[in-house]
């Protein structure tokens, strides 16, 4: 029985390896941002625009994260609940990053000095749990999931775009994503939330 299980396990690994390591690519413009014309390449998986005015804002309205990713009906990988959980996780990660150590206020109402944060998930690539537990596959990246997103900060009163980003990538080869389909996507979102906090801190001279 053990031999059968072992054969099945390694068979699944080799089959997935033979299929190659899927990585999230730039999904292109999703039509979510209010303006794409000022985006500039920061690195191979990151486009960004910064007006230089973010330091004037210390309060933030976080809109519900939009799910712009659409699965092919003939090949549904994620349940609706998994995608809804991903949206909630991203918003929570951003809220925690902004307010950590008494950083910034998350509010509900528009006002002077308040920016509105809009985030849309544009792609999700599933984590293959069976390929995420060995040293070899972690090094090669086999089984890594990922995600892509678009986001912007706009003045809550005027709608002026303050910052805009388009990001995509795969999960961590070090951190364990577990056996959930969205484990690596969540790791990425946690990282992106921390990057946002760092950008705001930098704008405030912290």
Predicted regions and their residues:
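Bacterial N-terminal signal peptides that target proteins for export
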Residues: 1-12
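C-terminal motif of bacterial Sec signal peptides marking the signal peptidase cleavage site
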Residues: 17-20
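Sec-exported extracytoplasmic/periplasmic mature domains
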Residues: 67, 91, 95-103, 126, ...
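Second-shell loop/turn segments in exported
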Residues: 74-85, 104-106, 175-183
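Compositionally biased, intrinsically disordered linkers/stalks adjacent to structured regions
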Residues: 169, 177-206
């Amino acid at each position: 029985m053990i031999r059968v299980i072992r054969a099945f396990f390694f068979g699944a690994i080799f089959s997935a390896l033979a299929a190659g390591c899927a990585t999230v690519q730039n999904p292109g413009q999703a039509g979510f941002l209010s303006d794409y014309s000022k985006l500039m390449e920061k690195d191979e998986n990151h486009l960004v625009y910064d007006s230089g005015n973010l330091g004037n804002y210390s309060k933030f309205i976080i809109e519900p994260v939009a799910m712009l990713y659409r699965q092919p009906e003939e090949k549904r990988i994620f349940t609706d609940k998994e995608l809804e959980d991903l949206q909630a996780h991203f918003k929570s990660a951003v809220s925690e990053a902004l307010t950590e150590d008494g950083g910034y206020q998350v509010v509900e109402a528009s006002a002077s000095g308040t920016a509105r944060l809009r985030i849309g998930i544009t792609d999700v690539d599933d984590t293959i749990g069976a390929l995420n537990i060995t040293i070899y596959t972690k090094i090669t990246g086999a089984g890594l999931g990922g995600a892509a997103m678009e986001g912007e900060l706009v003045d809550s009163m005027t709608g002026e775009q303050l910052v805009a980003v388009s990001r995509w990538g795969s999960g961590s080869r070090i951190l364990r994503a577990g056996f959930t389909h969205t484990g690596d996507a969540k790791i990425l979102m946690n990282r992106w939330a921390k990057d946002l906090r760092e950008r705001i801190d930098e704008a405030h001279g912290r």
